[in-house]
């Protein structure tokens, strides 16, 4: 899931106890910072950078899988991902392995109970949103599914797909190869016809998808979970345009819209992320999220899709929390992240 910021004020040091939660908020919320709108050159990434599940963007997939493992063990869990913990263990990042297994608690890395509980609930809500999206799509008769930037997503294995469903997973070659091998070692069997498509989404993935058997004449359910902030603005537009071009009428798309923060929120966020990075580094894990995400101004996702012929529905994190009867939290910063929008759309 840091750039020098000077000495942290006392209230931020106190909030730094939320290290793990803050980083997961950053990943799940896909933050765009108002101060950085219109700026470029802030990234250390390159146009053709690659990664595995223990480095760079790939490590964030392992972090989210860690959170799914924790959410699956929660009292009255909203989700059940039995593959999350063994996959995290297979990746081998010690910090995440110990957290996912329960050997290390969030509190052990300085995370107070409220932030930790919110983080677990947040990932559960996000996961359930996409689980329900696919359930609704298949209930409507869709039998072709595309999971973009699949990472350690195990929906092909854990969701009850109707007979005849075909699931295409797209991600970088090293990620696809690792997950496929790790799940085979667990003797896991997919519940649908699964096709792993090893291609970078910045390359010609539509051709690779069609070469794997994808039929653009059939309605499809696409997901782009926690993805858009890892693409430059033009890349986001190209991705959405490609999805539209591949979509037959009645196709569906689920994604998240990056959250725009004002200047004060931007400064506080950087301080919190600095605390998270320091806490991780003390545990032997070195990752600076500010080097992974593109901060440049981009088109509003909901508006862009609507302009391309999609019928768009949005829900905030707050609304999804309330729908599950989960309590709000007093921390204003955490509550702000619950304003992020979850988007589902149908092509008409």
Curated annotation (Swiss-Prot):
The keyword S-adenosyl-L-methionine applies. The keyword 4Fe-4S does not apply. GO terms for biological process: methylation. Keywords: Methyltransferase, S-adenosyl-L-methionine, Transferase. Its EC number is 2.1.1.-. It comes from the Bacteria. Transmembrane segments: none annotated. GO terms for molecular function: methyltransferase activity. Pfam families: LCM. S-adenosyl-L-methionine binds at residues 171, 200-201. It is an enzyme of class 2 (transferase). Exhibits S-adenosyl-L-methionine-dependent methyltransferase activity. Belongs to the UPF0677 family. This is Putative S-adenosyl-L-methionine-dependent methyltransferase MRA_3439.
């Amino acid at each position: 899931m840091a750039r020098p910021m000077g000495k942290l004020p006392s209230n931020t040091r106190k909030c730094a106890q939320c290290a793990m939660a803050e980083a997961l908020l950053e990943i799940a919320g896909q933050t765009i910072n108002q101060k950085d709108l219109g700026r470029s050159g802030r990234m250390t990434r390159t146009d053709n950078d690659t990664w595995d599940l223990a480095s760079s963007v790939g490590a964030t997939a392992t972090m989210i899988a860690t959170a799914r493992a924790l959410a699956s063990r929660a009292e009255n869990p909203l989700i059940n991902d039995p593959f999350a913990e063994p996959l995290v263990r297979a990746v081998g990042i010690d910090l995440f392995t110990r957290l996912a297994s329960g050997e290390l608690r969030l509190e052990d890395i300085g995370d107070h109970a409220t932030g930790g509980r919110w983080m677990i609930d947040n990932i559960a809500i996000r996961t359930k949103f996409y689980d329900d999206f696919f359930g609704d799509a298949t209930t409507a008769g869709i039998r072709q599914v595309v999971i973009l930037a699949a990472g350690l997503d195990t929906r092909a294995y854990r969701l009850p797909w109707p007979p005849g469903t075909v699931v295409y997973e797209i991600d970088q070659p090293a990620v696809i190869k690792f997950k496929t091998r790790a799940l085979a070692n667990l003797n896991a069997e997919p519940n649908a016809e699964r096709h792993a498509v090893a291609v970078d989404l910045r390359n010609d993935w539509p051709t690779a998808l069609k070469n794997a058997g994808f039929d653009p004449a059939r309605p499809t359910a696409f997901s782009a979970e926690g993805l858009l902030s890892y693409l430059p603005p033009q890349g986001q537009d190209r991705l959405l345009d490609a999805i539209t071009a591949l979509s037959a009428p009645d196709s569906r798309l689920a994604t998240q819209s990056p959250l725009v923060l004002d200047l004060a929120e931007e400064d506080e966020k950087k301080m919190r992320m600095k605390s998270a990075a320091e806490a991780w580094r003390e545990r032997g894990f070195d990752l600076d999220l500010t080097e992974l995400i593109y901060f440049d101004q981009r088109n509003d996702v909901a508006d862009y899709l609507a302009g391309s012929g999609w019928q768009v529905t949005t829900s905030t994190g707050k609304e999804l929390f309330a729908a599950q009867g989960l309590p709000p939290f007093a921390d204003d910063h955490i509550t702000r992240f619950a304003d992020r929008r979850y988007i589902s759309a149908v092509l008409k």
